[in-house]
Amino acid sequence: MTDPKRIVLNDDGWIVSQIMTPVTTAVLKERIVDTYVDSGLDTLSWCMGDTGRQRYETLDILAQPNYLPQGRENDLAAQNLRRLIDSDGGPVTIFTKLCHEIGLKFLPSVRMNSHYDRAVADDVGSIRQDHPEYLLGQADEEFVSNTTQWGIRTGLDYARPEVRSHVVALVIDLFERFDTDGVELDFMRHPAFFRVDEAYGSRHLITDMLRRIRARMDEVSASSGRDLEILVRVPPTLADSARIGLDVETWIREGIVDTVAAGGGFIPLHAPVEEFVEAAQGTDCQILGAIESLRPATEEESVNAIASRLYEGGASGLYLFNFWHKSADWKRRVLNVLTDPDHLSRATKRYEMEYMERLAPNDLHSYAFRYAVPPVQLPVGLGFNLTGRGTVLSLTIGDDIERAAADGEIAWCTLELGFSDISAEDEIEVLVNGVPLPSETATRRFGTWSRQEWTKFPDRLAEVDYDGGVIEYELDGPPFRKGENEIEVRTIMRTVMKGAILSLRHVELQIEYDG
């Protein structure tokens, strides 16, 4: 029997500002904590705000009875925060108690930066309002619109010692004054901390800041007997982390952090979790693979596939973001599968390769995401290569298809490719690990095809149409293997006088087991 995997789930604090029902301790218990009973969840992290504005019982708020921020007397979040403080001490106090009562660990989560649009943000926190000189872009500076530096200009600049001191005090308060199990530092909300041209050379500054937090945590742990944890969520590669000023390898090597959630969950199949696992070899640092509730990870089959791939890469568990909205039934059903690798190995899976359109900037925060997340393989243009070799894509899977097929355990397995600007006259050849797929048994559909895409966060899903076609292969004795696989797509014949480039936009492998 394989050891169970650890699951950490982040709740973004939605309930304080998003429901009309007055938020009380009973509501937090019923709507949040109790939904994880018997789910297999190990740790709940709850967003208490960011480094600019907080929604918990800070010392400043506690010192002002009946206080509501000026101009926010009718603000739901402010009213609910005041109510929770006056009744039972406040959100961090309440969540710590409720989680411990059902055997969950609790980590308050700090969003390490935010890049607000000044034109629409009504509350960006006093540090930004009182000290605009602490921001990544100064009021008298002009940036070229829609560039990375323009997009991150409203975030706090960690090159300023005042900013780092402010963050240290905020973070230490969360494990020093409360009976929490440590703290989560979420560097993926939102991942820009220095000016673009200064970030790599400034990475020692955040490392120094974390050393200070680690030192104080060790002191608190020694004096209280509590087992405290620093969990960090970082970009999906070590190189991208370092490029934006986060020296994750040093944090792991020096024991500054206990757990690393690798990636924001935007490209979980493509993210090289293996390099984090390798960096943690010989240390006590735990590596979690990150999944966010974005397409394709909105459906159980896709979540199963991503988890299987991350475990294949050596992850000791998962970090789930924006799955708080799922029902208690979903959490019990799905999370218990994810914690059990043996059960997961036989679960239905859909491996859907990520595509670049999902990372297109549409607000200031998304510029930071695009800044920290590397490009992926789709979409890709298909042409006539001079060497005769086709376009090659890599897909890593966690399923031992070869063994399962040999044992007669696979009910069906299909590979689906979606193209734009393809027609019935075009001839395509597909090879998997050098084995040609039988084109004569493939199913072809031409015309408009669609898929669900997260077109603009947080506007939910929408059907996006493509003019082209889909080719689907039913795989009997699938040539896929556990680990990395090579999918080669060759253009054999193209429609005469067709000017548009043939583009591969969608690759999906589905596996269902017998029993």
Language-model regions: role of each:
Residues 27-57, 177-182, 257-262, 312-317:
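Catalytic domains of carbohydrate-active enzymes, especially glycoside hydrolases
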Residues 41-86, 192-196, 262-276:
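Aromatic-lined carbohydrate-binding/catalytic grooves of carbohydrate-active enzymes
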Residues 162-284, 302:
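Active-site neighborhood of glycoside hydrolase catalytic domains
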Residues 316-405:
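Aromatic- and carboxylate-lined catalytic core of secreted/periplasmic carbohydrate-active enzymes
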